[in-house]
Structure formats: C-alpha cells, structure tokens
Amino acid sequence: MHEGYKVKLDTFEGPLDLLLHLINQFEIDIYDIPVAQITQQYMEYIHTMQHLELNIASEYLVMASTLLAIKSQMLLPKQELEDDLDEEYMEDPREELMQRLIEYRKYKEIAERLKEKESEDNQLYTRPPVVFEFKDIPEKITTNQTDISIFDMVGALKNMLKRKEWTEPHDTTVQRMDIPIETRMKEVLQQVQSNSDGLVFDKLFPSPTKNYIVVTFVAVLELMKDKQIYAVQERHFEELYLYSMEEST
C-alpha cells in the first residue's frame, strides 16, 4: 500500500485510550476488568487496523502483549501462583493496569473540563451578540460531532465486515490503488451530501475487495479531518451515520 495513504494514529493518545473506549463501550467495571473479554476486543481492533494497514504505534503492540500476559497469569491455577509467590506479596495481576487506567481517565476528564472552559471563555469574549429565533433551531438534532473517535470508526468498520458476511473472499493483499484517494473522497462527499437524513456508513462499501475497503475508509477519515463530514452513532453497536457539515450549518 502506498505510504501516503496510511493513516497515522499518532494524534491519538494511545492504547490506554483504546482500552477506555472498550470499557465504556461494553460498560465494564474498571475496578473488575474481565481480562479475557477486553483482550479479545482489543485484539480484534488491532487486527482490523492491521488489515487496513494503518500505522500502528509500537505502544499498541506492547499493550497487546501486556494484556495477553495478564490473561495467561489469571488462567494459572491458584495453587501454582501461591507456590511461585509469597502470599503477602500476591496481588491481582490486573492491579497495575487498573491503576494506570484510573489515573489516565482522571487526566482525560480534567483535560476535557479545561477544554470546555476554554471554549466557554472564547465564546464569552469573542462571540458577537446573536438574536435567536425558533426558526433557527434545526429539525435534526444530532449528538456532539466530536464524540466520534478513530476507535469508533474502526469499530464501525469491524462490525460492518461481520454484518456483511461477504459471499466472496476479501483480497489478502493490496497490490495497487485502483482509485486515487482524492477521487474516492469526492465520491464519498457527493454520496453523503445527497443523503440529507444521513448516510449509513455500511452503504459506502458495496465491494468486498481490500483495495476498495481501505481507500474508502481512508477517504472517510480524511473528509472528517477536513471537517467536510461528521459521524453520528446514537448508541454503541448501532449503525453509524455520516452527515455533510454543510447540512448542519
């Protein structure tokens, strides 16, 4: 796959973000993490990103190894653990990861509050007076456009591939880009703009070929980054809809 079409995840904080995303998505108790479940879901995301040939930072793979190690340790018989460790030094194998997640979640919450305060201050000092009328209220109420993360998008693609159950196999290699990314971006944007009530994400993938899936997914991410479209998902695991930013203004 051409280097220019790879999507970098460096702008996202890393594997702890993905783990928190999964914990929220599956409504998991952060103080009692089901390691087998979270490891399976985490690995599915990693495999999907690898399938798309995304640039995955090494930290994601280190976390995958950590999860697998914790999972293996928890599968050991209790007596074997007691033989290896003095009882007073025994602790939950998940403890360190749990503490990292709790601290990181606190950091994110503080950062989000600071971001909201900064936004409020900017509106207070720079926003001109506006007269609101009922006719200005849009009929279509959507969720916060910033709520959708790269992990939501990868998850939507992962679930779409499962739902589609292609009758023909995917290509296993990307030999060349049959569709230039700029061309596919224009096609996707036109398709989204022609559906003012929202375009179901799955509708962008009529072809099971890997070339088509990768270039379409990258086109969607680029359009979102350029603030030409945005995504809405009312609830976890439900269909994801794409809207044109022009429709929301």
UniProtKB/Swiss-Prot annotation:
Keywords: Cell cycle, Cell division, Chromosome partition, Cytoplasm. Its main location: cytoplasm. InterPro entries: ScpA, ScpA-like_C. Pfam families: SMC_ScpA. Gene3D superfamilies: 6.10.250.2410, Structural maintenance of chromosome 1. Chain E. GO terms for biological process: cell division; chromosome segregation; DNA replication. GO terms for cellular component: cytoplasm. Component of a cohesin-like complex composed of ScpA, ScpB and the Smc homodimer, in which ScpA and ScpB bind to the head domain of Smc. The presence of the three proteins is required for the association of the complex with DNA. Belongs to the ScpA family. Participates in chromosomal partition during cell division. May act via the formation of a condensin-like complex containing Smc and ScpB that pull DNA away from mid-cell into both cell halves. This is Segregation and condensation protein A. The gene is scpA.
